[in-house]
């Protein structure tokens, strides 16, 4: 009965424009889904047996690197962090200062982890390089809009947090293209093992640009942040990204019911 009520509520919310169709997605069967990271910073991915020693691009560091650190430690991977936010860059410096040391305290609730919570005893500094740029469709100088809550760390290029306004408080940052990063790290367009996108709305333009250019990571973890503020514009933008991925041969194999999704490229 509970399941029937949930399905009815989901249908009703979609009819009222409160819920996107993707938010009914859960785990597809037949995949080796793994979860790494804190309660706040966790991501789900498919362990397909090819991740040992791989390279990951992780856009949107913030102040919770739990997924990135755990992934780098578990797979001996290089996790390229991409974030120009001042607080994120400061957090990265704190992490590097503790490389080689184990965790001293448990993860805290929320998205601001102390560096002492990370198990860095199996990490080399070369595994966690930081690119201090905003991931975008071109390399330029852009407005990076502040969150509506000053306590939050995440800035946005599209400013969905402030109703897509162009005149709210912002800083200016340099942006970069994913194709330039692939060249810098010597990775072919179809050889990136995993891409994580937590970039506050800019994922729509970035994903469309990637698909247009034939850039095909094996799997993509993406947060469609705009689903946190449901409206027609947000739903249309998420539809654009989902359609671009589907047309390029990706399948959504996991959703957490709110904003986080995992897309896997067809073999």
Q: Across the structure, where does each feature detected by a protein language model lie?
A:
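Phosphate/nucleotide-binding beta-alpha loop and adjacent structural elements of enzyme active sites
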Residues: 1-267
